[in-house]
């Protein structure tokens, strides 16, 4: 019996997969629970259409992420912080600080997409990785300078 899964089913497949199951399993478990629909020509055609729409949407998201990555590489960020002895910062520079500085330059990013293993605590230039999409990552150049007293 051929069915199209509506949701992920453990040990069988993911939502949208066309699967071949034993008739009893399909009739008595998958269909009554709404986990699958029969694979008639109409449903198969609708599935193909949904997959095409999803693929187009994914391609559009990836393209916009690549555009943001390009823009990030062209947008250096300079942050001024108070420093103590031996150029140690009072406090630190966090992902939120970088996100706010980028927002001031017109690049809106969620702070969780900025990958800082640990906050920046010294002066200097840093390449900070940014996770924009599952397949696209960018880098932003962050310069931490001493604030004029």
From Swiss-Prot:
GO cellular component: ribonucleoprotein complex; ribosome
InterPro entries linked: Ribosomal_bL9 (IPR000244), Ribosomal_bL9/RNase_H1_N (IPR009027), Ribosomal_bL9_bac/chp (IPR020594), Ribosomal_bL9_C (IPR020069), Ribosomal_bL9_C_sf (IPR036791), Ribosomal_bL9_N (IPR020070), Ribosomal_bL9_N_sf (IPR036935)
Gene Ontology biological process terms, A to Z: translation
Gene Ontology molecular function, alphabetical: rRNA binding; structural constituent of ribosome
Keywords: Ribonucleoprotein, Ribosomal protein, RNA-binding, rRNA-binding
Keyword rRNA-binding included in the entry's annotation: yes
Task of the protein: Binds to the 23S rRNA.
HAMAP family the record matches: Ribosomal_bL9
UniProt cross-references to NCBIfam families, sorted A to Z: L9
Stated family: Belongs to the bacterial ribosomal protein bL9 family.
Descriptive protein name: Large ribosomal subunit protein bL9
Lineage, broadest ranks: Bacteria, Pseudomonadati, Myxococcota, Myxococcia, Myxococcales
Gene this chain is encoded by: rplI
């Amino acid at each position: 019996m051929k069915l199209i899964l509506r949701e992920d089913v453990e040990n069988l497949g993911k939502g949208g997969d066309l699967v071949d199951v034993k008739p009893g399993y399909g009739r008595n478990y998958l269909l009554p629970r709404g986990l699958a629909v029969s694979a008639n020509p109409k449903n198969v055609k609708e599935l193909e259409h949904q997959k095409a729409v999803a693929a187009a949407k994914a391609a559009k998201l990836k393209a916009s992420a690549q555009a943001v990555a390009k823009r990030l590489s062209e947008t250096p960020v300079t942050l001024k912080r108070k420093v103590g002895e031996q150029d140690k910062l009072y406090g630190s520079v966090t992902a939120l600080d970088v996100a706010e500085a980028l927002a001031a330059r017109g690049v809106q990013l969620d702070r969780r997409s900025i990958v800082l293993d640990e906050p920046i605590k010294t002066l200097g230039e840093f390449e900070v990785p940014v996770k924009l999409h599952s397949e696209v990552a960018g880098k932003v150049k962050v310069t931490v300078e001493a604030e004029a007293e």
